[in-house]
Design a protein with these regions (language model features):
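Short hydrophobic alpha-helical membrane-embedded segments
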Residues: 1, 99-105, 157-167
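Extended alpha-helical regions
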Residues: 1, 91-94, 101, 105, ...
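Alpha-helical transmembrane segments and their helix-start/interface "positive-inside/aromatic belt" motifs
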Residues: 1-10, 182
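Hydrophobic alpha-helical transmembrane segments of integral membrane proteins
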Residues: 3-7, 99-138, 187, 191
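Juxtamembrane non-transmembrane segments of integral membrane proteins
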Residues: 14-64
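Individual transmembrane alpha-helix segments
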Residues: 60-120
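Hydrophobic alpha-helical transmembrane segments and adjacent short intramembrane/lumenal linkers
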Residues: 132-188, 193-206
Length: 206
């Protein structure tokens, strides 16, 4: 998971910097990254007011983000240097612009990691439903005349992990704000489906 987060941060920063250089974003400079960060925080405020993991997810998210920002960027003087050179002109301003965008993008990934943490129960529920559904279909096949397919079992089993990781990686890395439920609910459904297929196609007799 740590590797996925690190890769997502590096990928997101690279895409953001290329977008700034190429003029892809409607907002100038670091404005695009700041807008995405604000929008991502709004998803927590509006859609994750309750959680099975944290009693106060909104307050917890802001506390975690503030703590990380203060420890990594404020205490080291990085944030103040960027602020001081944000309108100084020349190379210093360019460095400050790209640096501030990198900070904001890193915080966006952190917010999304927190959102993923809040959606862990969703993936657990999808996995449980998938296992139960698969076991029921396996028993029907076991006591009936159903045929086994090692091909389906091995391919479904092999895809389960990559689909889970790839879904997280894409969600963490997209350079624009996306509704978490729009993306993560289908991912959880696909994850549960693969588990169901894997469990249901497991050989009838051990």
């Amino acid at each position: 998971i740590v590797a996925v987060v690190v890769v997502s941060i590096l990928t997101s920063i690279a895409v953001e910097w290329v977008g700034i250089y190429g003029g892809w974003w409607a907002q100038p400079g670091a404005g695009h990254a700041q807008g995405v960060l604000t929008h991502e925080l709004s998803w927590i405020d509006t859609q994750f007011t309750r959680s099975l993991i944290f009693s106060q997810p909104v307050e917890m998210a802001r506390a975690v983000i503030t703590t990380v920002y203060d420890a990594v960027f404020v205490a080291t003087g990085i944030a103040s240097w960027f602020d001081a050179h944000s309108s100084s002109g020349g190379v210093s301003q360019t460095i400050a612009t790209y640096g501030q965008a990198g900070i904001d993008v890193s915080l966006v990934v952190l917010v999304r990691v927190f959102i993923l943490t809040l959606t862990v129960p969703l993936f657990v529920m999808a996995a449980v439903v998938g296992v139960v559904d698969g076991l029921v279909r396996r028993d029907l096949r076991k006591f009936g005349a159903g045929r086994e397919s090692a091909f389906i079992y091995h391919h479904a089993k092999r895809l389960t992990g990559p689909v889970f990781i790839l879904g997280w990686l894409i969600y963490l890395s997209v350079p624009f704000s996306v509704n978490p439920n729009t993306f993560l609910v289908p991912c959880a459904a696909l994850f549960g489906l693969l588990i169901s297929v894997t469990t249901g196609s497991f050989k009838k007799y051990l």
